[in-house]
C-alpha cells in the first residue's frame, strides 16, 4: 500500500462505515494522464448498484473537501467480486483454506509471483502452501493479493 492509499484509507473508512458498509480496501491506479481511485466495499447482505452509488456520493463529498489527490482521476466503487482483493490480515484469516494469487514487492526465493492455499495468519505474516511447500510472507511485502475463484 502506498502512502497515498494509506492516507485515503484512513480518511474514507469512517464515512464508508457510516453508510453501513465495510471498506474492504482501495487502489489508486496511475495510468498516464488518467488515474483511477477504486474503492471496494462489502456488506453481509451483498452489494448492489444502489449501495455503490450511495458510497460514491458519500466518498465524493469527503474527497471534494479534503482534496488529497493532486491529479485528475475517476472514482469507482464496487464489490470485491469473485477475484476478491485481500488487503488486511483479517481478510486472509477470513479466507483460510482458499486459493490465492500473490504478487510481492520484494522477491522471496527469487520469485515475486506466488499461487497457493492460505494456511494461516500470525500477526502481520501469512503462511501459504505453494506447490506442496509452506511459504511465509510479510503483509508489508505483498503488493497485490487476490482470491482465485473456483468454478
Swiss-Prot record:
Keywords, sorted A to Z: Cytoplasm, Ribosome biogenesis
Please give the start and end residues of each transmembrane region: none
- Top-rank taxon, per record: Bacteria
Q: Which CDD domains did the record assign?
A: YlxS_C
Pfam families, per this entry? DUF150_C, RimP_N
A Gene Ontology annotation in the biological process aspect, one of them, is: ribosomal small subunit assembly
List the subcellular locations: Cytoplasm
Keyword Lipoprotein listed? The answer is no
- The answer to keyword Cytoplasm applying to this record is yes
Cited InterPro entries:
Ribosome_maturation_RimP, RimP_C, RimP_C_sf, RimP_N, RimP_N_sf
This protein's GO CC annotations: cytosol
| Similarity comment text for this entry | Belongs to the RimP family.
Task: Please describe what this protein does.
Answer: Required for maturation of 30S ribosomal subunits.
Its protein name is Ribosome maturation factor RimP
What's the source species for this entry?
Answer: Vibrio campbellii (strain ATCC BAA-1116)
